[in-house]
């Protein structure tokens, strides 16, 4: 019996664009001049990290792009290792961002704490500028799904 393929073939021009932009994201979003020297992130290490972020967002559904996650990594890597703190994710849906944040947190030497009600988005309330009533329950997930994906 053949082993299941964990990777999807690039099937659209948009997917090709995202794959082709990996070196650019590694170079410009994770710009070495802004990263703290504690992390010793060479261009090859940054390229590998961005590739892993991209691969995981293709493997596990996530509400954010790998580019947004690379931007989060860039902000985190500006902070010296000696500064105490943890990384917190509020809402993990299926665990795609959690998977990538765990990689980023490990490189940064920080713990990742994840919170989720697994009920999805709440009801829209008066005063919510961008919330839509039909979004209630969107992004609901389960602990089993997250733990199997992370």
Task: Please describe what each predicted stretch is.
Residues 1-2:
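Soluble, non-transmembrane catalytic domains of enzymes that act on hydrophobic metabolites at membranes
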Residues 5-8, 119:
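Poly-acidic low-complexity segments
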Residues 7-86:
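Class I SAM-dependent methyltransferase Rossmann-like catalytic core
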Residues 46, 52-59, 77, 81-150:
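S-adenosylmethionine/decaboxylated-SAM
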């Amino acid at each position: 019996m053949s082993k299941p393929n964990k990777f999807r073939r690039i099937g659209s021009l948009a997917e090709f664009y995202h794959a082709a932009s990996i070196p650019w994201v590694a170079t410009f979003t994770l710009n070495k001049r802004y990263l703290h020297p504690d992390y010793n992130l060479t261009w090859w290490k940054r390229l590998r990290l961005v590739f892993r972020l991209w691969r995981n967002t293709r493997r596990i559904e996530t509400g954010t792009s790998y580019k947004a996650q690379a931007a989060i990594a860039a902000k985190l890597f500006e902070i010296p290792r000696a500064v105490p703190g943890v990384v917190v994710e509020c809402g993990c849906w299926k665990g795609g961002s959690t998977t990538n944040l765990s990689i980023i947190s490990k490189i940064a030497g920080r713990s990742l704490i994840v919170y989720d009600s697994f009920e999805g988005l709440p009801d829209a309330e008066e005063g919510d500028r961008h919330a839509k009533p039909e979004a209630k329950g969107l992004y609901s997930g389960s602990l089993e799904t997250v733990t199997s994906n992370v």
